[in-house]
Amino acid sequence: PGAVSWLYGADRLYQLPLGIVGIAIGIVLLPELSKHIQNGNTEGAHLAFKRANEVSFALSFPAAVALFVIPLPLVSALFEHGATARSDAVAIAQACAIYAIGLPAFILQKVLQPLYFAQEDTKTPFRFAIYAMVVNASLAIGLMDILGWVASAIATTVSSWVMVGFLVTGARRFGSMAKIGAEGRQRLTRIAVAAFGMGAGLWVLNAFCANYIDTTLLRILYGPTLVLAGILLYALFAHLGDAITPADLKRALKRS
């Protein structure tokens, strides 16, 4: 395997939370936003947008932290067998950690774009996507000689946040509907603290256990075990910090 395979493997791994969270949010949010906007219910649209922001962040940020902190055990469990050597797993994990930084941005795009689509504006997001694509290509080509194959992953991550920046700036014209408010910012801060707490716990756990994972079977079992530990740690910190509860997620993902 070479650079293309490494990037492909990392892409498959971070696409899992992106697909589950991003698509679910988009499917639920767009019809609800459209309904409120058509009815002239600005407050309802604002609440729907705020709720989608909180839920998407609550699901994507801990996933990004985990992919950044413990990418190698996750990659090893999935890919380190057959023709994929340890050096390949390390390279895939490196790309995965870079992509993890952009994961919240990719999911935020799924939250922000429905604001435009609900107003029947598809041209503006398309124009922003073109700008982000130019940034992506420019960085990938410009950094290739300096950084090698990881330039592609870095370019993808940077361009994802550039796209979010364009969408946030453009959404100002939607007024209060596109704002999360002080309460929303406090909730996002508590979610971030819970995710960082989870990340610290996973880092410590992996530091103690990694040297004992020396067989294929243990590698396969170790990755899912860390995922389960991360879920439990995040749930604990989220509960202690009053960040978000399963009931909050259920209400947010339920169509009204």
Spans of features found by a protein language model:
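Membrane-embedded alpha-helical bundles of multi-pass transporters/translocases
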Residues: 1-256
